[in-house]
Amino acid sequence: MSFDFIKNKKVHFIGIGGISMSALAEILLEKGFKVSGSDVKSSEATERLELKGAKVYIGQISQNITSDIDLVVYTAAISKNNEELLKAKDLNIPLMDRAEFLGEIMKGHKYNIAVSGTHGKTTTTSMLSSITLEANLDPTILVGGNLDIIGGNVRIGNSPFFITEACEYKESFLKFFPFIGIILNIDADHLDYYKDIEEIQNAFIKFGKLIPKEGYLVCCADDRRMEKIISNVNCNVMSYGIETGDITAKNICFDKEGRAFFEVYKSDKKLFSLNLSVPGEHNILNALASISVSLILNISVDNIINGLKSFKGTHRRFEIKGQRKGVVVIDDYAHHPTEIKATLNAAKNYPHKRIICVFQPHTFSRTISLFKEFTAAFDNVDELILSDIFPAREKDTGEISSSMLCEQIIKRGVKCRNIKDFDSIVQYLNNILTEGDVLLTIGAGDVFQVGELYLNQ
């Protein structure tokens, strides 16, 4: 199904407060559409949309759907029995899921840049956004986090350039139309949908095949799974990496806060030197991905350097929240063992006496499928506090719990305890934190509130 952006003028979003859904709604408001939507609770995103003219319902009931709506867009997180979804079907209102609708918007742009990969999508999209803005390309941007330089999670440009994250969950990125497709890495995740890593890799192969012959696949040569991707695409390829690739980083060193300095090479030719403003070795790879795309777009070296230098990070990605009594509070969205290790490595390079970590596992299915990997992810912390699992779209069957995870982590010699609620966690932190410690909250749920509660006492 395709969407007529001239004929259809009233669109309703089920789950309008989501990071991507709110961005799509904002794009339509800017284009003059009548926008309505619903969510289970009010948020900064819903309040922002209301200020821009959207009608937002808190609570999802059938009465929110009226016969004058031209299209209903829904998020994959909603139930098949959602009242609004069922009412839209009864009224024969056309339906699109979020990814399909985003694909329809992408059709209106010539140079779609889709950033995929298990880890690093938000940071790389944000880095690329900073560079293209520095180069005055006036892109439209959709990012999975709040980025200060665009004042939120969406920027509406007036050019052929469109930059977006492309998530592999339920193969949603196969509904996109990339001219440049980035694959940052391939790792085991979303195992509630995919059978195994091979099935995940096959999804990325399909994504690569979406890129037209004149387009580009940009991928990390350090990831051995990319070889199969490259051999299956019919487009130009530019690879990057620390170990190998067309674009590489050499002579890497770090400052006292873990931020990298390195030299960027294309084949054996040095292009320029670069200081990143965000910490962690993983961000070298994210930067190389954004540099590769920038070179394809013929963006000048000065614009690349200035764009990356001015990028200070996105919210919830190694975000320094503040200090209290000499304790630095940092928050990170990491929710996969690989991401957690990268975040802890970055924290290790940050000045600290001890690293005290509060982790909130995200979804029961992920905790079960990656249980062994989670138990080994926290070896570098001085103490770990586990909150209860954040369920997101899932129900607790009793099959897994944070206390089970805690038991196995303790067996590895890590000091760990399971404290269920945030108020009790903060009370415990008040008793153990001392000047010079780093308090690191990690997880994709609402664990950031622990740091905020600690700071705002």
Curated annotation (Swiss-Prot):
A Gene Ontology cellular-component term: cytoplasm
Enzyme Commission number(s) from the entry: 6.3.2.8
Keyword line: ATP-binding, Cell cycle, Cell division, Cell shape, Cell wall biogenesis/degradation, Cytoplasm, Ligase, Nucleotide-binding, Peptidoglycan synthesis
InterPro entries associated with the record: Mur-like_cat_sf, Mur_ligase_C, Mur_ligase_C_dom_sf, Mur_ligase_cen, Mur_ligase_N, MurCDEF_pg_biosynth, UDP-N-AcMur_Ala_ligase_MurC
Record bears the keyword Thylakoid: no
The UniProt record lists the keyword Ribonucleoprotein: no
Gene Ontology BP term (one): peptidoglycan biosynthetic process
Signal peptide: none
GO terms, molecular function: ATP binding; UDP-N-acetylmuramate-L-alanine ligase activity
Location(s) in or outside the cell: Cytoplasm
Family matches, as SUPFAM superfamilies: MurCD N-terminal domain (SSF51984), MurD-like peptide ligases, catalytic domain (SSF53623), MurD-like peptide ligases, peptide-binding domain (SSF53244)
Annotated metabolic or biological route of this protein: Cell wall biogenesis; peptidoglycan biosynthesis
Pfam families: Mur_ligase (PF01225), Mur_ligase_C (PF02875), Mur_ligase_M (PF08245)
NCBIfam families according to UniProt: murC
Biological function: Cell wall formation.
Record-given protein name: UDP-N-acetylmuramate--L-alanine ligase
Species of the source: Clostridium kluyveri (strain ATCC 8527 / DSM 555 / NBRC 12016 / NCIMB 10680 / K1)
